[in-house]
Structures are given as C-alpha cells and as structure tokens.
C-alpha cells in the first residue's frame, strides 16, 4: 500500500491521526464537564 510513497515519517502519521483523536477527546471531555456527557 505504501510502496509508491516509500518511507512515511512517523510524525506525519501521528499528526494526521492525532489531530482528529485529540479533537474527539476534547469534545468528549468538554461534554462531560458541561454535563452533556452524563446523559450518555
């Protein structure tokens, strides 16, 4: 799958996959702190 691109820097993969994860975690904690997460 990654044969044409060669080596992909891990920091690029970490950034691309980390930003959405941090966003979802941030939304989750914001919802729990504001009281919205308690209804889940």
Swiss-Prot record:
Topology term for the membrane: Single-pass membrane protein
Main location (coarse class): plastid
Pfam families: PsbJ
GO cellular component: chloroplast thylakoid membrane; photosystem II; photosystem II reaction center
InterPro entries cross-referenced by the UniProt entry: PSII_PsbJ (IPR002682), PSII_PsbJ_sf (IPR037267)
Domain of life (superkingdom): Eukaryota
Transmembrane segments annotated in the record for this chain: 8-28
Location in the cell: Plastid, Chloroplast thylakoid membrane
Alphabetic keyword roster: Chloroplast, Membrane, Photosynthesis, Photosystem II, Plastid, Reaction center, Thylakoid, Transmembrane, Transmembrane helix
GO biological process, one term: photosynthesis
Keyword Cell membrane set for record: no
Transmembrane helix among keywords: yes
Family: Belongs to the PsbJ family.
Its biological purpose: One of the components of the core complex of photosystem II (PSII). PSII is a light-driven water:plastoquinone oxidoreductase that uses light energy to abstract electrons from H(2)O, generating O(2) and a proton gradient subsequently used for ATP formation. It consists of a core antenna complex that captures photons, and an electron transfer chain that converts photonic excitation into a charge separation.
Subunit structure: PSII is composed of 1 copy each of membrane proteins PsbA, PsbB, PsbC, PsbD, PsbE, PsbF, PsbH, PsbI, PsbJ, PsbK, PsbL, PsbM, PsbT, PsbX, PsbY, PsbZ, Psb30/Ycf12, at least 3 peripheral proteins of the oxygen-evolving complex and a large number of cofactors. It forms dimeric complexes.
Protein name in UniProt: Photosystem II reaction center protein J
Lineage: Eukaryota, Viridiplantae, Streptophyta, Embryophyta, Tracheophyta
């Amino acid at each position: 799958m990654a044969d044409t691109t060669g080596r992909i820097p891990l920091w690029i993969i970490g950034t691309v996959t980390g930003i959405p994860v941090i966003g979802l975690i941030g939304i989750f904690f914001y919802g729990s702190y504001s009281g919205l997460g308690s209804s889940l």
